[in-house]
Amino acid sequence: MARTHIPGFPRIGAQRELKFAQESFWRGESDEQYLLGVARELRARHWQLQQDAKLDFVTVGDFAYYDQMLNLSALLGALPQRFGFDAKTLSLARYYELARGNAAQPAMEMTKWFDTNYHYLVPELGPQTTFDGGVEWLFDEIDEALALNLPVKPVLIGPITYLWLSKSHVAGFDRLSLLPKLVIRYSRLLEKLKQRGIEWVQLDEPALCVDLPVEWLDAFSAAYDVLGTSGVKVLLATYFESAAEHAPRVAVLPVAGVHLDLVRAPQQLDAWRAALPKHAVLSAGVIDGRNIWRADLGEIFESLQALHAEFGERLWVSSSCSLLHVPVSLDAEQKLDADLKSWLAFATEKLGEVATLALALRDPAAAEATLAAADRALDARRHSSTVVNALVQKRVAAVSSAMADRQSPFAERNRLQREALGLPLLPTTTIGSFPQTPAIRQARAAYKRGELRALDYLQRMRAEIEIAVRKQEELGLDVLVHGEAERNDMVEYFGEQLWGYAFTENGWVQSYGSRCVKPPIIYGDVYRPEPMTVETTRYAQSLTQRLMKGMLTGPVTMLQWSFVRDDQPRSTTALQLALAIRDEVVDLEKAGIRIIQIDEPAFREGLPLRRGDWAAYLEWATRVFRISAAGVADQTQIHTHMCYSEFNDILPSIAAMDADVITIETSRSAMELLDGFGAFAYPNEIGPGVYDIHSPRVPDAQAMQRLLERACEVIPAERLWVNPDCGLKTRGWPETEAALTNMVRAAKALRAKLAAKQPDEVTA
């Protein structure tokens, strides 16, 4: 009989309870005990959902107070030495300082978890890293679950993935040299699990789905030769891509089973079936853990029948990956179109899908009604008139190659823009958003509840825009933004104004820490019925004589940060988005806006995990960006913004986007990203972020000037812009004004220094 489990479950809570408890703790409004209590309640609730779905295992260890990689660093005793914290006595307050920074130290670096929109904190390792052990929250959670008589399956990120995703803080240090010590620590952790009577442990190794060098693969084999004989059965979990080429290697290791992502990489199944020994468990990840569409249970059931006949009780049915990447439950969705809602499955519903498949394998008659209901929903979706728009189909068919090209090359555009815009050396600007104050959030909530008239809401937003404009003028910024007071989210705001999009009331997923996003759903062809930002941007420009920058979200990011329809290629949906954004760019230019930013923070996130698959993605991703941007005159300056990214391996494609200015996240990595831009001789203008907006720490003007001087060593000052790392939506006004004051001072001081050619430095 097939068994059931999931790799992980969302931790934030159906009503974002963890987020609100975290932020209350950070503000000093509640203590650690309150936060611990909320976390305990959430874990128990999520375990009970798995029990209620009749899963054979309850997953424990997927919870984190901020991030699972940070949790693992704390458990291993591998905290950044620069903080001086003792991992064994780590408090939640200090745990959060690692994630958010403090007065003495900036936060740990944060970057994307593989090709998802989740962010993890990058471990900082070096020769002095000992893995002596740390705070054992994991075992507290296991004990909680055991006390509830639950069938516990702990989950940990595996040692190879942990090292692969870490960074060395010592130049030239080979972090793989730490593996022997790390394996010893993992072995001790597994021994503690054995002492608690744990039968199975899930060790996540998604790094096996990227292009690992051979020395890392050999290290993987050596590690699991040890860990597989710990006395606890190891389920080696891979996800997000195929790991088929490693099947022969894994087959000779003493691991008791493997988990495969058969949604993203169904083609790998045959290799694993051929390689796995007769005793090994195959965990089939057949329910999509990264998208919200109801599964075709009938088709999946048919495919599982042959596997079940072959593997019997060694077949486990599961989701493709952790359900962290989808909302918790459809129960709270009262306003979704009924037909659309019937096409969806969130995390809780996916538990039911996993259980239904196992039931169908055991007793087809018992699952017949549920399978039939799924078939009816899928059939209704296939034939719905809301999915296809003839106008969009006609326009997509008419797209030409010329639509992706600006009128002139960058050098000519740059000359014309310098004449038209009249900006100083090292122009200062921000990335777009300003603090979303309680007053802004309350007004938006009241408007959405129908308690505030549209005209009153418009007046309040215009008042906030004027505040943002006046503050920027006082700060001395060169290029202003309207502050995005009216925008709840950089994707949702636009999606709400496009056909083919739908929105949930409570479809939150965790992006990082307490930051949650509510991705819209692209269910049909995308079309812009009317301008989206023109009136707001025109109003903001009317308040000032300075340049006002229009702010849009790019087609790739709209795609990546939405739940995307799965009935046509993603590239087709991206092209539809590009055409909608192109129309908005043209309308902004007609309204007198001479600088327009098309944000693409998720551009790199869309890269396939395997380098061999990159070229096809980069071709269509750069094309749709260019189509979105190329409808304007040469004198109109197009900016783009990217954050949390490593660009060096895709710089030709970044250059091919042909944005006049790119702003990037660099402050946490001490401008190291710029080295690649310099070596590549990136031709266009660039704004390296000079301070980290994710930390409440305000760097002084001297520190920012040093970063700018470092940037000038790589990029000519004539092509540099000065800006923060990212938008300022999540920050408060006092720290925002303090940081921007220092940023402007740093830019002015460096301008003067470059003009005078003397080494005077600003004072803090």
Swiss-Prot record:
Keyword Hydrolase in annotation: no
Residue ranges the record marks as coiled coil: none
Sequence similarity: Belongs to the vitamin-B12 independent methionine synthase family.
UniProt source species: Paraburkholderia phytofirmans (strain DSM 17436 / LMG 22146 / PsJN) (Burkholderia phytofirmans)
Protein name, entry field: 5-methyltetrahydropteroyltriglutamate--homocysteine methyltransferase
Residues bound to 5-methyltetrahydropteroyltri-L-glutamate: R16, E17, L18, K19, K112, R515, C516, W561, E605
Active site: H694 (proton donor)
Gene: metE
Reactions catalysed, as given in the entry: 5-methyltetrahydropteroyltri-L-glutamate + L-homocysteine = tetrahydropteroyltri-L-glutamate + L-methionine
